[in-house]
Design a protein with these regions (language model features):
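Active-site SXXK
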Residues: 78, 89-121, 147, 281
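Conserved active-site loop region of the serine DD-peptidase/beta-lactamase
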Residues: 209-258
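A short, well-structured edge-of-sheet supersecondary motif
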Residues: 49-85, 271, 281
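Sec/Tat-exported extracytoplasmic proteins
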Residues: 61-64, 72, 101-111, 120, ...
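Mid-domain, small-residue-enriched loop/turn segments at the edges of structured enzyme/sensor domains
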Residues: 67, 160-216
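Conserved catalytic neighborhood of penicillin-recognizing serine enzymes
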Residues: 123-159, 166
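Acidic helix-start/capping segments at beta-turn-to-alpha-helix junctions
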Residues: 75, 113-130, 163-164, 190
Length: 311
């Protein structure tokens, strides 16, 4: 779709207005992650300015002409690093981790050999695995593998349909305490972000806490949790994101996302450290220009700041 220069500038100005740090660092966390009130935001902004990492995140935003949202928690100490953690961002393909988790929760590991049939008309862009198996169909297990490890869009759509649609995944997330996330569309439409809308958005805090619940908590049984963890740890799409910002020897299980406009780029991860409890990290970003391209270095550098702040 073509846009006039004036329209693009207007949208850019709208996004730029959000470039004000709203959140700070503290001890512990809350499962609820609704946007802050004006007074709370003002207080948090003042607190954030006193934090060394707050300045680092502000610098990254200026450097990359971006809006950056961060929520990270040390699950051993409860210490957190937060920056715009209650603001809404497009979640893009990061939701696929939870689509797989919700299918595991619904079917259990014993039900993952169910074969799902589909046709060529079901295929959408960025479906490197499912496009090879139109004739035979794929098991739920293999669809989860394709969606999480290769970010296969058709696989994700088939998982959503297995659950009952995007709103069914939304309901599944509410059951584990997430009342922030909005799931409304299928791939690839959900990757187009509208700054005026809340559809297909979440907050860094909400998705970090969802990931913690599914991978480290009790949302899944032991076997199902182990399977989801294996998919995340063997993800093929995250080498330049959170994985690039942690020290050698640390293990990362992540799910990435990329928007089709505003340079949207996201990554959510559980990070296992030697001799210490895991970190859970969610970094969601967008650029200020509608036609901007994503830059993986923004997330890698933000991750390095998180690591420095929590270790």
């Amino acid at each position: 779709m073509q846009h006039t220069r004036a329209h693009r500038c207007a949208l850019s100005a709208l996004v730029a207005l959000t470039l004000i740090p709203l959140t700070a660092c503290g001890e512990g966390s809350s499962r609820a992650a609704s946007p802050s009130s004006a007074s709370a935001s003002a207080s948090a902004s003042a607190s954030a300015a006193k934090k060394p990492y707050g300045h680092a995140f502000q610098k990254l935003e200026r450097t990359y002409s971006a809006r950056l949202g961060v929520y990270a928690v040390d699950t051993g100490t409860g210490r957190v690093v937060t920056y715009r953690d209650g603001e809404r961002f497009a979640h893009n393909s990061t939701f696929k981790a939870f689509a797989a988790g919700a299918v595991l929760r619904k079917r259990s590991l014993s039900g993952m050999d169910k074969v799902i049939k589909y046709s060529k008309k079901d295929l959408v862009a960025n479906s490197p695995v499912t496009e090879k198996h139109v004739t035979s169909g794929m098991t739920l297990r293999d669809l989860c593998d394709a969606a999480v490890r290769y970010s296969d869009n058709t696989a994700a759509n088939l998982l959503l349909k297995e659950l009952g649609g995007p709103k069914a995944l939304n309901a599944a997330l509410k059951k584990v305490g997430d009342h922030v996330t909005h799931m409304e569309r299928y791939e690839p439409d959900l990757s187009t972000w509208d700054p005026h809308s809340t559809r297909d958005t979440t907050s860094p805090r909400a998705f970090a806490e969802d990931l913690r619940t599914f991978v480290l908590g009790d949302a899944l049984g032991k076997a199902e949790r182990a399977q989801l963890t294996r998919w995340l740890r063997t993800n093929t799409t995250g080498g330049e994101l959170i994985r690039a910002g942690v020290p050698k020897g640390w293990a990362v299980g992540d799910k990435t996302g990329m928007g089709s406009n505003y340079g949207g780029r996201d990554d959510i991860a559980v990070v296992w450290r030697p001799h210490a409890a895991p970190l859970v990290v969610a970094i969601l970003t967008n650029r200020t220009e509608e036609d901007a391209k994503p830059d993986n270095k923004l997330i890698a550098e933000a991750t390095s700041t998180v690591v420095d702040s929590l270790t």
